[in-house]
Curated annotation (Swiss-Prot):
One of its GO terms (molecular function) is structural constituent of ribosome. Binds to the 23S rRNA. It comes from Rhodospirillum rubrum (strain ATCC 11170 / ATH 1.1.1 / DSM 467 / LMG 4362 / NCIMB 8255 / S1). Pfam families: Ribosomal_L9_C (PF03948), Ribosomal_L9_N (PF01281). Transmembrane segments: none annotated. It comes from the Bacteria. Belongs to the bacterial ribosomal protein bL9 family. The gene is rplI. GO terms for biological process: translation. NCBIfam families: L9 (TIGR00158). This is Large ribosomal subunit protein bL9. Residues 165-194 are annotated as: Disordered. Residues 166-194 have a biased composition (Acidic residues). GO terms for cellular component: ribonucleoprotein complex; ribosome.
Length: 194
């Protein structure tokens, strides 16, 4: 089915483009959400008549999205979750959880705007994209930790890595040496007991 796009759609086209899409995609997504019109002579005339208004509306939405993007870009969200010894979560962190945390921070974001390919299932720091407008996409950092203190330690380590990468590498090397020494001591204790 050929449709006329009423707004920019990622991986498809820009406003006013006539594109060929699968019938189901048009009927189930583009047409109901008023993101496109079926291609016909009357719809082409309608689009050309409304083009200036649609462009003005699109610019207004883009401006609003950019205003939110300034506040949201680079935000660190802390998600406290229970996890096993290996760092694997007992549950997961999904787009819904991220949306709920953003709402608690005062942002009005729909779940579909959080671009998360798969749920987060391990502790750590994750870069996540949020699409505020088809042309405005920001990146936030989701920190998944067992506690607030662990999240702050992770944030401090990441900040140290950004400020002085050579010091961070040295800190990681020292941490690995200390861990290896601890394991060697445990092995020696087991040998003496055995």
């Amino acid at each position: 089915m050929e449709v006329i796009l009423l707004e920019r759609i990622e991986n498809l086209g820009f406003m006013g483009d006539i594109v060929k899409v699968k019938d189901g995609y048009a009927r189930n997504f583009l047409l109901p959400q008023k993101k496109a019109l079926r291609k016909s002579k009357s719809n082409l005339e309608y689009f050309n008549a409304q083009k200036v208004e649609l462009e003005a509306l699109n610019l207004k939405r883009k401006g609003e999205a950019e205003a939110v993007a300034v506040k949201l870009d680079g935000l660190n969200l802390v998600m406290v979750r229970q996890a096993g010894e290996s760092g694997q979560l007992y549950g997961s962190v999904s787009a819904r959880d991220i949306t709920d945390s953003l709402k608690a921070e005062g942002f009005v974001i729909a779940r579909s705007q959080v671009l998360l390919n798969h749920p987060i299932k391990d502790l750590g720091r994750y870069e996540t994209r949020v699409s505020l407008h088809p042309e405005v996409i920001v990146t936030i950092t989701v920190v998944v930790a067992r506690s607030e203190a662990e999240a702050q330690a992770s944030a401090a380590a990441a900040a140290a890595l950004l400020e002085r990468p050579e010091d961070a590498e040295e800190a990681v090397a020292n941490e690995e040496e200390a861990e290896a020494a601890l394991l060697d001591d445990e092995d020696a204790d087991e040998y003496e007991q055995g």
